[in-house]
């Protein structure tokens, strides 16, 4: 398995370029402090926020495999006691000779239509701590997608897996996932646009 593609799940867990603006991964920053990694990514996607949100929340029936082949399982579990949705993902990846299957069970909160928050349940995951936020803001004919994550794995990582190595790796592998998210969002939006066009045509008769 390619290390550059497989390392992404360690941090990210967590994208038909047929429009004027293709997906544009503007920036990725990775830092580490006291064993905890911090990731910030800034992207433009040529699709509306509601379509991107639909893709990001579509965990059922292992459908996260559509975003990246590193996802082996994904789905919704029974909700938490307060009714908050809980999702499960499992990814497989290798860092050179170091290979693992990584589980994450997370609470998913749609705080606003354009803000998704997640928080890992450590006793059911391979991470001591992990929280993330997806900010989806309208921008031009598409969406500015800002992603932040703080993560502390509960397993040993080789010493060479530092911020510089992870940033280089993510810059190599992340654009494909970003392009796929954009493509899936455009596909989800297309039936709506076609339906609206059909209605408009009917009204002019």
Report each predicted region and the residues it spans.
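Bacterial N-terminal signal peptides
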Residues: 8-17
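Hydrophobic ligand-binding cavity/cleft-lining segments
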Residues: 18-84
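Glycine-rich portal/gate segments that line the openings of hydrophobic small-molecule binding cavities
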Residues: 32, 36, 44, 74-124, ...
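N-terminal secretory signal peptides that target proteins for export/translocation
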Residues: 1-3
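Extracytoplasmic/secreted envelope proteins and their assembly/folding machinery
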Residues: 49-57, 133, 174-178
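Hydrophobic pocket/interface hotspot
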Residues: 52-56, 62, 108, 118, ...
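Sec/Tat-exported extracytoplasmic proteins
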Residues: 47-49, 56-63, 91, 169, ...
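Beta-strand/loop substructures that line and gate deep hydrophobic ligand-binding cavities in soluble
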Residues: 120-172
């Amino acid at each position: 398995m390619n290390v550059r593609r497989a390392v992404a799940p360690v941090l990210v867990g967590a994208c038909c370029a047929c429009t004027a603006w293709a997906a544009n991964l503007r920036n990725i920053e990775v830092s580490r402090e006291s064993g905890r990694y911090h990731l910030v990514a800034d992207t433009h996607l040529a699709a509306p926020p509601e379509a991107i949100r639909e893709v990001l929340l579509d965990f059922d029936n292992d459908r996260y495999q559509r975003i990246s082949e590193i996802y082996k399982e994904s789905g919704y579990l029974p909700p938490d006691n307060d009714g908050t949705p809980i999702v499960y993902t499992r990814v497989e990846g290798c860092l050179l000779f170091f290979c693992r299957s990584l589980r994450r069970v997370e609470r998913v909160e749609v705080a606003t239509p354009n803000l998704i928050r997640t928080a890992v349940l450590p006793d059911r995951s391979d991470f001591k701590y992990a929280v993330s936020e997806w900010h989806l803001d309208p921008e031009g004919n598409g969406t500015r997608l800002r992603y932040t994550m703080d993560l502390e794995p509960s397993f040993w990582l080789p010493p060479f897996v530092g911020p510089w190595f992870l940033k280089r790796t993510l810059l190599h592998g992340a654009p494909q996932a970003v392009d796929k998210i954009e493509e899936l969002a455009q596909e989800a939006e297309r039936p709506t646009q076609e339906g609206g066009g059909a209605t408009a045509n009917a009204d002019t008769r």
